Design a protein with these regions (language model features):
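Gram-negative outer-membrane assembly/targeting C-terminal domains
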Residues: 247-271
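Sec/Tat signal peptide C-region and signal peptidase I cleavage site
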Residues: 19-24
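Gly/Pro-enriched, hydrophobic low-complexity segments
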Residues: 34, 84, 95, 106-110, ...
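Mature-chain termini and adjacent capping regions
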Residues: 25-26, 52-59, 144, 168, ...
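Bacterial N-terminal signal peptides
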Residues: 8-18
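Short amphipathic beta-strand and strand-loop transition segments with alternating hydrophobic
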Residues: 67-71, 150-156, 208-209
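Bacterial N-terminal signal peptides that target proteins for export
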Residues: 1-9
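N-terminal mature ectodomain segment of secretory-pathway/periplasmic proteins
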Residues: 27-113
Length: 271
């Protein structure tokens, strides 16, 4: 009997070592998180043309035409998102600034109805982006890579082999846990599940990954509020890489008239 227990223990040890080696053979957590972050934010020095749809009771309630510029200027990294249409929403803008010397961000928002540029703290970036199911942070620098992410293992999700990562954000105003499923081949997120402070599933995010010009990228993001059943969708219509972006569009003071900047015509007319 003792020999049988020893044999069983040896087998379990071999299986555990094999599993550990298989996980260890892949990229480390930092690499996975970095690539996931880039996938969600879009490529640097590029412009994304997108549609944002708000879904209520199963039907689209509103659709916004967005442009998003991602680039560097004045010693910082910036992501600017601007609503170009419809007319009643045109000019809504969100500017996210990431200092190159730190991981902290500074957020600016502009609502045409008030004609004011508002600067707010990073913690407020988790608030809803103008009544959609996305937060401001979802449209800016995604706050990942704080060191708390852990690789749980690999599994299959929606027919794709994925890495499963678990994160317990410290002092997060809304989330106690975030589970991410990242495709092993592209390191792009397939799904992310957000749990509230009480540990209940709050939101789910699903991403569609397609290969465009030989490069895997996210072409659709669906954020669903589990409690309300409502959702919001971002469809990436086009990505214009390696684009020279004028530095003045990243100036907070210019947000008041940013929708009329001539730069947007150079990218939207190329569709």
């Amino acid at each position: 009997m003792k020999r049988a227990y020893l044999l069983l223990a040896a087998i379990l040890l071999i299986v555990a070592c094999a599993t550990t080696s298989a996980v260890a053979a892949g990229p480390d957590v930092k690499t996975i998180v970095t690539q996931m972050k880039r996938g969600l934010q879009g490529p640097d020095n590029a412009v994304r043309i997108m549609d944002l749809k708000v879904i209520s009771n199963g039907s689209p309630a509103v659709t916004w035409k967005l442009v998003q510029a991602n680039g560097n200027a004045n010693g910082a990294h910036w992501i600017l998102t601007v609503v170009l249409a419809p007319p009643d929403a045109r000019g809504i803008a969100f500017l996210d600034k990431e200092e190159t010397s730190s991981t902290s961000t500074v957020n600016y928002a502009y609502l045409p109805a008030t004609r004011r540029v508002i600067e707010f703290a990073p913690v407020e970036g988790y608030d809803a982006f103008f009544a959609t199911d996305f937060s401001y942070q979802d449209l800016g620098f995604v706050l990942l890579g704080g060191g708390g992410e852990k690789l749980v293992g690999t599994e299959t999700r929606d027919g794709k082999k994925v890495y499963k990562l678990e994160d317990h954000p410290i002092n997060h105003p809304y989330y106690s846990k975030v589970i991410s499923y990242v495709a092993t081949d592209s390191l792009m997120p397939v799904e992310r599940d957000f749990y509230d402070r009480a540990g209940k599933l709050f939101k789910t995010e699903h991403c569609t990954i397609e290969t465009v010009d030989g490069v895997p990228m996210i072409t659709k993001i669906v954020m669903k509020n589990v409690e309300s059943g409502n959702s919001s969708e971002i469809d990436v219509i086009k990505v214009i890489p390696n684009k020279q972006i004028p530095a003045d569009i990243f100036e907070p003071k210019n947000l008041l008239h940013i929708a009329d900047h001539p730069f947007w015509k150079t990218v939207t007319q190329s569709q």
